[in-house]
Amino acid sequence: RDMKKFLNEVIYIIKDFPKEQRYVVGDRIESTAIDSLHIIARVYMGKDLNMRIADMVELQSNLELLNTLIEIAGEHQWIKGRGKLANLLLLMDSIGRQSTAWKGSLIEALKRSESERSQC
């Protein structure tokens, strides 16, 4: 849900980027956010724990890239208004925490599954 909020915010904020950055940094932010939503859906619907964990690693990599690009955009004042930047950073923090917890629960489920298999 927070990722969807983040994407909605980004779509409007990118419009205010300088033209030369809108099509470089802005497009990268938007496409990475969309890719991240796709990864979340893939993890949610996936069955193979190893694959889901690998997808979570990919998601966390995307989130790190998004966070860095948002910080750069903020430093260059391409994001108009401190409140908008702060909101994006808060959403990124929340998404990061959720993904870390989700990945941790998947790793625990994998350990339990492997433990059950070794006991058989």
Locate each region found by the language model.
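Amphipathic alpha-helical assembly/interaction segments
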Residues: 1-120
